[in-house]
Amino acid sequence: MAGIVLTWLERGLIAGIFGAVLILIGTVAAEGLLRVRGTAPEPIRQTATVSVARAAWLISGVLWFALLARLVVHTLTVFPFPEGLSIDALLTVGLRSRWGGRWQVLLVLVTALLACAWHAARRPRAATAFARDGIIVLLTLALPRLGHANGDAWRLAAMTAHLLAGGVWLGALAVYVIGRDARAQPLLLQGQVWHRFAWLAIPAAAVVVLSGVVALLRIVETPSALWPSTYGALLLCKGVAVAALGLCGWRNWRSGPEHGLGVPRLELALAVTVVLLTAWLTDTAHP
């Protein structure tokens, strides 16, 4: 029973980490859209940019704590309770294992990101924002190494593209919906920004699908092996959710932001489902 609880806790933390990174990529995309001249009046652009910077700082803090929690839970899957909570066990897994070596890279990057994001939120400067965005890109490059993508260059490249494109599409959408629900100054609500986001999201969605197919072909030796496996069932569910996301995105693009948040909220709920399924896939042996 304890093993099942730990397994699901770890999957939940993986989903939280993936989701946080997607939103961080989304803040980069949203801020980039806001930098384009003519997208919104200057006062709104400045206020929205500060709001995005604060969101990046908040998500960075959540990600930092999620990484620490992941270390504790992963250690408990290796060592029995209460030995798994000892300093020696945590150091063994976090500092002396292969998994811990990759985890350390993520922790260092997120710690640096937290410092940069805090500084960018307090005193917005172009140099600080670029440093923060650069760390987010490095974090995106490092994260796939913790899953099935590690050890194969093509698979790693495909999963990195999958994550980056997913962040541009779904992460920016999350920034838009959360910002609107919080009744902050419009982030991606202004007409020009919305339409630019749509034209950014369309190719990003295509990259998500194509990179996912490439990664699958590198992971699975024969597609027929997917049918009777848990991995294949999860992959099918994820494919259906991504297809539904595409339909919602098309509906959003056709209707524009003036029709409210009904469809964007549904799209965001589907995005959460996709992230949860991705975390489950990452923790599931492939055929």
Task: Give residue ranges: language-model regions.
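Polytopic transmembrane helical bundles with strong interfacial aromatic enrichment
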Residues: 1-287
